[in-house]
Structure formats: C-alpha cells, structure tokens
Amino acid sequence: MNSKIEIKPGRLTLAELRRMAKAPVGVRLEEKCKGKINASVQTVGEVIRQGRVIYGINTGFGLLANTIIPNEELEHLQRSLILSHAAGVGAFMADSTVRLMMVLKINSLARGYSGIRLEVIEALVQLLNAEVYPSVPQKGSVGASGDLAPLAHMSIVLLGEGEASYRGQRLSGREGLELAGLSPITLGPKEGLALLNGTQASTAFALQGLFAAEELFATAMVSGSLSLDAALGSRRPFNPLIHAVRGHKSQIDVAASYRQLLEHSEIERSHKFCEAVQDPYSLRCQPQVMGACLNQIRNAAEVIGTEANAVSDNPLVFCKENDIISGGNFHAEPIAMVADNLALAIAEIGALPERRTALLIDSHMSGLPPFLVDKGGLNSGFMIAQVTAAALASENKSLAHPASVDSLPTSANQEDHVSMATFAARRLLEMADNTAGILAIELLAACQGIDFRAPLKTSPLLEEAKSIVRQVVAFYDQDRYLAPDIKNAQALVQAGAFNHLVSRDLLPSFNR
C-alpha cells in the first residue's frame, strides 16, 4: 500500500482521489477534526435528552417519518435501517469504486455535521486501510434520498453482516471485520442514517468517469494528431489567430496542445505548400470539438470535486446553533447533470476518431494503401476494425441519452423527484471502455499510416507515441489475428500511457 493520505475533511483534492481510484492508498484522519465530530454526537445526545422529535433520530424514515420511536428502540432502529435498505441487485462494484465510496463517506462524516461517533468513522478507516471492501451491488439507487442501497451494503459490514472482498477473495461481513481487526459495531442514534444518507456511490462512479474521460481526452489528442499527419493534413487550422477571435478558453488551450504535439514533423514539412485547401472536419475541427469536450470535463471536475467534499447527510447537526435541521443535500442532481454532460463528452471524444479511422482506410481520402495494408484484396487490413469502431461509437450514442431527466417517484410518493445520478455516473465507465476501444483502433491505424510515410518521420512527441504503440503491436504487414492487437492498444489507453504527452495544465486532476 502506498503512503497514507491525511484526510482533511472537506479538502480532498482531485489528484488525491485519482491516486485512490488507481490503487489502494491508506488514509488517516486529521487530528483537529475529531473535536467537531465528538461535539456533533453530544448535540444529538442533548436533543434526545430534551425529548425533541427529530427525523431519523427518534422517528421512522421516508413516509414513516411521523412514527415516533421510543428511546429504548433507537439502537434497534438504526440496525433495522441498514438491514432493510441493503436491497441492491446486480454485479458487485469494482473494489476501486467501493474504495472511493468509503473515502468519500469518511470525508463527509469527518466534517462533523452528522452526529456519528469517531469510533464508527475510524472503523471505516480501518476497513479501508486493511483493503477489506464491502461487496456492494451496482444497481438499486435512484440518487435520492442519497445512495441508500449501495451505502447500506457498504455499512452492513460494520455490523458483521453482508459480504466483503479482500484481494479478490469473497468473505462474509464478519470475516471481513475480523481480518481488519474489528468487531461488529452497535450503532447509536442517527448513526445508521448518517452512514446511508449521501451521494457517495454516485460521486465515486462520477469520479471514475471523470478520470477515464481525462485519459481518453489525452489519448485522443495524440491519436488525432497522428491521424492528421498520416493523412497529410494541415496544421494551419490550429493557428492561434483563429481560436483567439472565437474566445473559448478550452478551445484555445486545445489548439495550443495540438501545435505542440505536431511541432517539427518532417511529414508536415514535406507537404507544407501543397494545393489542398481544407481538410475534412474530423481533422480540421479538432480544436473546436475537443475544446467543447474539455470545457465539459473541466466543469464536471469542478462540480464533482465540490461534491466529493460535501456534507450530503440528512438531517444535519449544527453544534454552534444547537440545532438539527432536515434538508435535501442527499439529492444528487448536481452529479446527475454533470454525469450527463460527461457522457456527451465521452461520446464525442469517441466520435471523431471513428471518423478519422474511416478516413485513413479510404485511399481516396488519405492517399494511403486501401485499408492500410499492402496487397489489398489478398489482405483486408483494417476494414473490419473500422466497423468495430463504428459499432462502439453508435453504442455510445444510445448510452449518452440523459439520465437526469428520467425521474420516478419512490417511497409512496414522499420522495417524488429523484436524480438517477447513480446510473448517470455508472454508465460513464461502459462508455469510457467503448471509447478506449475506438481510440485503440485509431492509434493502430494512424501508426500504420505514419509507417507508410517512411522515411519521413512525424514530430518527436508523436514518434514517442508511435514507439509506445509499437512496443506492444507490430506493423501490420499482412492479415493476422487483430483482436489481441486492439486489446493491447486499448490497455495502453486505459493505463494512461499517453497522458504525459499533453500539458499537465490541460486536464483538472492531472495538476491538482
């Protein structure tokens, strides 16, 4: 496990969250947050002693909020809440998703507005540091009142119930606790609700979608530049004068990055004074399209970063005011909307490379051998690889349909508008996988095209990119089993093998 990250409640950075998403990282709580945590517990105790009726502390839940629960049943109320709400279905989330969800929940609870004891938060920290991850089904949340079912499955392990995993091994919840050196916890008033209310599952998926979108974006900048050179496209549309007069910062930044990637290309110099006037849009309009995508990524990073540090519990404990107030911070509409926008960006990041691959295999458009292989007819080359890219791009168009407008009332109409944020964010991972496949195919096609331009070379940065590809996939001199080549190139995309070739200032979590 890597060195520990100190959780300063409400101040987790995207760079820290990226680290946690990629590999197990130990955490510890900042010492000075503990006083506020303890004070919130004292406030809950004082409210109970005063005999005040507060939702979720001494009442039922949802439509049953008007049912008053006697003090001697308050512990049972919290246990029952978690058991009944652990009702998710489907395949379990990846450990990386659960790891993020746990970190986000710890971060939120540690801000001291939830009335949950320090020992419960520390138990989550201990589970996380032991790499014992609750087994959480992917489906069952509508993103309001928070991610109830996923967080119940996360929390049920603290009771010694449910299931967990440890380095690929499936365990019972009790076995997971023992492995982490813990015993089952008896929850106090409000603690079950504090664990369950929140947007941490939706936000964990959204973070993973954001990080994947950034890596796809970086790769698409590289693969698009390779395709431009392979097709003898012009750099003139990337001239800063063009982008300055439009004024969109992300477009300006993207155009600058393209210029940097293409600088000192021998191929480009060889046709600098050719008669071609305008390239097809998939080459010429890359700064405009990718700039718009970058704008969505940057906006999503801002919103998701805020939500990752938010208190999304209900009700909230305000110690200074000696008050506990019911509200709606559990409603994940901000995540749902930015996830929808990220879906559009991921689809568009994949749409351009599919079109460029189609251009490269068309000898009339690219001037390269048909389907990028010698002895066409005997060899089919990249013919069906482009069909695969088209299939993936089309699938992404369907997956990009907005989820945030698709509300359904729940809990006997008490919860009559919900966000659907969990699905909105979860489908980003499938879309990102599709786009990684499209980019893998473009990388192979573009590198093939560059090799056909030998002895001329592309730019130094793009030669480095081609070298990365050629380390795992050889030149395609005749037809061979192509699926493993695509898989190997896709693994490069998903590992962020090309991230270092674009400016670290371009993408949000690369530089925070």
Swiss-Prot record:
There is a cross-link at A144-G146 (5-imidazolinone (Ala-Gly)). The modification 2,3-didehydroalanine (Ser) is found at S145. Pathway: Amino-acid degradation; L-histidine degradation into L-glutamate; N-formimidoyl-L-glutamate from L-histidine: step 1/3. Contains an active site 4-methylidene-imidazol-5-one (MIO), which is formed autocatalytically by cyclization and dehydration of residues Ala-Ser-Gly. Pfam families: Lyase_aromatic. GO terms for molecular function: histidine ammonia-lyase activity. It is an enzyme of class 4 (lyase). It is found in: Cytoplasm. It catalyses: L-histidine = trans-urocanate + NH4(+). Keywords: Cytoplasm, Histidine metabolism, Lyase. Its EC number is 4.3.1.3. Its main location: cytoplasm. One of its GO terms (cellular component) is cytoplasm. GO terms for biological process: L-histidine catabolic process to glutamate and formamide; L-histidine catabolic process to glutamate and formate. The keyword Lyase applies. Belongs to the PAL/histidase family. This is Histidine ammonia-lyase. It comes from Desulfotalea psychrophila (strain LSv54 / DSM 12343).
